[in-house]
A protein has these predicted regions:
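ATP/NTP-dependent adenylation/nucleotidyl-transfer catalytic domains that generate, transfer
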Residues: 1-36, 50, 58-61, 67-68, ...
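Conserved G/P- and acidic residue-centered "switch" motifs that form tight phosphate/ATP-binding loops
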Residues: 41
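Short, surface-exposed alpha-helical segments at coil->helix boundaries
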Residues: 44-48, 73-77
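Primarily recognizes the serine-hydrolase "nucleophile elbow" in alpha/beta-hydrolase
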Residues: 53
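His/acidic metal-ligating clusters that form di-metal
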Residues: 126
């Protein structure tokens, strides 16, 4: 298994990411803006800060997307004010309700609103649709804010928060993202905010059944968790969810594959 060690000098990592972001925009739209959903958590805050430092604050747009009344949306607003970037707010509450209600009279199964798989994943996909709508109108590129820890155990929604045009943090564990955030001078209240699922009131770690500290030690060093049940939980989640981060399998034609020649 590959591990995810970070440089002894975190500034080496920071400069690497900023240069990578700059190069991405040179190659994929020098006039484009970075469009990022701001939740008030560490990942979106750190990713947005890196984009601001790489591109300038005038080329970064933050989007708040509460679902109805959201108790922690004020923290997201504070992040936007801290970054001094242009922001928009789109409340997805009514969009979600309309989406669920569209199944009421035509769907031959249980009440969609009571299906936890639907209600936990649909808002993330709707938020991503909002980001791409804004990106389409403003000539932007959508920032993916997932980290390596979440990706390894599949703690994301396929085509939801796992989507995006470029992903500056996907090779960094939660531990590394926090270290980057502190080194960037981001206020601790944004970095230390415990991530929640936004539905049950539980933290991510409550839902996972282990801490990111244990997971990150495993990912960064390869040292197995002392508790075998935790290790088994981690690996079962990895095997069950790896499809979320792998490219979509494709059936290639018999004979020469023309897609292989698309790279000019």
């Amino acid at each position: 298994m590959r591990t995810y060690p970070i440089a002894d000098d975190i500034n080496i990592e920071i400069n690497h990411i900023k240069n990578w972001i700059k190069d991405y925009f040179v190659q994929n739209g020098p006039d484009c803006k970075a469009i990022i959903g701001l939740s008030g958590g560490k990942d979106s805050t750190v990713a947005a800060k890196l984009c601001v430092e790489a591109l300038g604050k005038d080329k970064v747009i933050g989007v708040y997307m509460p679902q109805g009344k959201q108790h922690d949306i004020d923290i997201a607003h504070e992040v936007g004010q801290y970054l001094q970037i242009q922001t928009f707010e789109v409340n997805i509450g009514k969009i979600c309700d309309t989406f669920y209600e569209s199944f009421d009279n035509s769907f031959p199964f249980d009440n969609v609103k009571e299906n936890s798989v639907v209600t936990s994943n649909s808002p993330a996909r709707i938020r991503m649709s909002v980001l791409y709508a804004i990106a389409g109108m403003l000539h932007g590129r959508v920032v993916n804010t997932c980290n390596a820890s979440e990706d390894f155990v599949g703690y994301s929604t396929k085509f939801g928060d796992s989507a995006g045009d470029f992903s500056p943090l996907s090779d960094y564990t939660v531990h590394a993202v926090k270290a980057i955030g502190y080194a960037l001078g981001i206020p601790a209240k944004f970095i230390d905010k415990a991530p929640e699922d936004g539905l049950s009131g539980k933290t991510d770690e409550d839902n996972l059944g282990f801490t990111y500290g244990v997971l990150d030690t495993f990912l960064e060093t390869g040292v197995l968790p002392e508790d075998y049940e935790v290790y088994k939980n981690i690996m079962e989640r990895y095997k069950r969810n790896i499809h979320k981060v792998k490219p979509m399998p494709m059936c290639y034609r018999v004979g020469p594959c023309h897609r292989e020649n698309w790279e000019l």
